[in-house]
Amino acid sequence: MGTLEKKLDNLVNTILLKAENQHELLFGACQSDVKLTNTQEHILMLLSQQRLTNTDLAKALNISQAAVTKAIKSLVKQDMLAGTKDTVDARVTYFELTELAKPIASEHTHHHDETLNVYNRLLQKFSAKELEIVDKFVTVFAEELEG
């Protein structure tokens, strides 16, 4: 195995370790004293942007509805979410952030923005020609991951 392959292997493994048991890799340290899972924080962020149901959240996060239900129950218990029934179909519940949850959702959004800023700073170090190669590599790598 060549040096570049080893570097790539180390990078992928480092990313996996940093994102272990999370559904994303974010830059920036958490400022909140509230202990939530990454999934719970992501749910708060998504709900701060639009009204969603359990099913909508599961699709957006690419996780099971059971996992969303578990996360939501915990957030409701911690007074971070309030459920409201749909006026047309009472079987459908929408969740809204409480005042307690809004700063946490905002911070999670900030971490997403900061992560994109880090990527942008990294990409600015490359020429247009090099960026074409990076883009091609990322595309091919993603295709390999999908199998």
UniProtKB/Swiss-Prot annotation:
Activity control mechanisms: Zinc acts as a coregulator and is required for DNA-binding activity.
Gene3D superfamilies assigned to the protein according to its UniProt record, in alphabetical order: 6.10.140.1680, 6.10.250.2360, Winged helix-like DNA-binding domain superfamily/Winged helix DNA-binding domain
Binding-site list for Zn(2+) 2: 30, 41, 107
High-level lineage: Bacteria, Bacillati, Bacillota, Bacilli, Lactobacillales
Ranges where the HTH marR-type domain occurs: 1-143
Transmembrane feature ranges: none
Subunit structure: Homodimer.
Pfam families recorded: MarR
DNA-binding annotation, residue ranges on this chain: 54-77
GO molecular function: DNA binding; DNA-binding transcription factor activity; zinc ion binding
Protein name per its UniProtKB record: Transcriptional regulator AdcR
Zinc found in the keyword field: yes
Binding site for Zn(2+) 1: 24, 42, 108, 112
Keyword vocabulary terms for this entry: DNA-binding, Metal-binding, Transcription, Transcription regulation, Zinc
Source taxon at top rank: Bacteria
Record function comment: Zinc-responsive regulator.
The UniProt record lists the keyword GTP-binding: no
